[in-house]
Each structure stands twice: as structure tokens, then as C-alpha cells.
Amino acid sequence: MKIGILSQFPQLYSTQRLVEACQSRGHEAVVINTLNCYMNINSIKPSIHYEGTELVGFDAIIPRIHASVTFYGCAVVRQFEMMGVYAANDSISIARSRDKLRALQLLSRKGIGMPVTGFANKPNDIPDLINMVGGAPLVIKLLEGTQGIGVVLAETKTAAESVIEAFLGLKANILVQEYIKESNGSDIRCFVVGDKVIASMKRQGPEGDFRSNLHLGGCGEVVKITAVERKMAIAAVKAMGLVVAGVDILRSNRGPLILEVNSAPGIEGIEQTTGISVTEPIVEYIEKMVSARKTNRPIIA
């Protein structure tokens, strides 16, 4: 097969590991900078051009769309889909998961546990908004934030009101979320491919920081997840319509809670922490799906 890896960062560990996994299974891997693609949108033969050449002959793509280019990245993935190319994560699912509010509403609709979350537009909604999620301490998140950036812990009601007023004053869209104190600044990252959790690790934030993102200095360790956590992670991925995803889970006094579903999860941290390859299962899944499409067999994930 000819597999395209959509990534702005060809030298990144995640990109290189995906290339290696494709090649080790006998496939041609082509790294494509998403932003350098341009599209011919028509009703007869839609196409994508790249650096002066039309992209042809691809069987599948693995989208690694950075959050900052979600709109254009999804347009490129959608164009590949129009050309009959299989996308490991399709454009609609990526867009769903990137919209934090919509993602939480989808989880809520499916009855999947998550922290109590509030969303508001007007400053005079603030006092009731804070009470709605259980009062301070609480977490305030920018809807557009990634990798722990734009996430603030407000220890008191006064601090919460000040931060919310400041964000809303800047016309920023925010979520207000209950703080799960018993998680102690840690979460569990599950790497899901299809209907399987391939690997999982516990991420612990640096001392004094409630955010556990490895990009912010957190550390990872191998963890054994429960059957409930495994089932919940898979259900969360299915709720988004994704195939490959990282699911972040908080352990709370009322059971596991889904914090986020990431459509382009980091690969380096979880592979180096667990010693498990997560890239080969991605390629194996693509092989199964492309083969089933060609033979019109029922697809069993």
C-alpha cells in the first residue's frame, strides 16, 4: 500500500515511528506537509496537489493534524476522502474531537462519565456558573487551548470570578470544570486503536502543578487500567467516531472520568514509558480496513 502521513513535522518522533511502521510491513510511506497541499474541488475528479505535483495512488492516510491548523487540515483530509482514500481518522471525527465543548456534549449524550462542566457567554452568569460545577477550587479552560496551555486552577471563588471575567472580557470561549482533587495532579493516558487499548500510562504533573501533560514537564509511568477504564476509553473514542486516539482519564472518588479525547495523540511519551509499539497496530488496522474496502467484506474492527 501507499500510505500518506499528514504531518507538518517530518522529523518528529511520532512521524518517524509511523514511517518505520509502514515500511516494516512492506508499505510505501510518504510524509505530506498538510499546509503545503492545495486542492482542486470539482464534481468530476477532485484532486490534491503538492509542491507542483498531483497526489495520486494513495490507499490510505494517517492524519496528524496539529490543533492550530484544524480547519485547513480537516479540509485536506476531507479532500482525500472524496478521492476514495481511507483516512485512519476521518475529517468529521477530527473536527468533533477538536471542539472541546461538542466533544463533552457527545460524551454526555452517551452517558460517559466526565467532570461536571459549565459553559457561559455573559459575565452576569458567573456566580451561578461557579456554583453549578460545585464551587471553588475549579478549573478554567480555554476552548482553543492544547497540551495544558490555557488551563487555570482557581483556588477560591474570588479568583475564579476574576479569571472568568478576564477571559470573557477578551471574548475568549472558556469551559469551567470541577476540580478532581483526589487525582493529585495525575491522569491516565490510554492509546486506543479501533476497539483496543494498545497501551496506557499514568502521567504525573511536576510538583505544584495540577496539569499532567508531558510537554509541561510531567512524567509517565506504566499503569494497569481497570476493565471499567478500558471500556470507557473505547466508548469515548467511538463517541467521537475516531479510530486512533489518546484518551485522558481521571480517577475520582465516583469512578473514572473522561477528561479529553485526542485525535493526534503523542507517540513518543507512551512508547518510551511502556515499551509498547503503538504505531504497528495503527498500520495493521489500516491494512484490515483497506483490504475490506477492496473486497467489500464486512468490516470487523
Swiss-Prot record:
Q: Which Gene3D superfamilies match?
A: 3.40.50.20, ATP-grasp fold, A domain, ATP-grasp fold, B domain
Binding annotation for Mn(2+) 1: D248, E260
Q: Where is the ATP-grasp domain?
A: 104-287
Recite the UniProt keywords alphabetically. Answer: ATP-binding, Ligase, Magnesium, Manganese, Metal-binding, Nucleotide-binding, Protein biosynthesis
Q: Name one GO biological process term.
A: translation
Q: What are the GO MF terms of this UniProt record?
A: ATP binding; metal ion binding; ribosomal S6-glutamic acid ligase activity
- Binding-site positions, Mg(2+) 1: D248, E260
The entry's family comment says: Belongs to the RimK family.
Q: Which NCBIfam families match?
A: PRK10446.1 (NF007764), rimK_fam (TIGR00768)
Q: What is this protein called?
A: Probable alpha-L-glutamate ligase 2
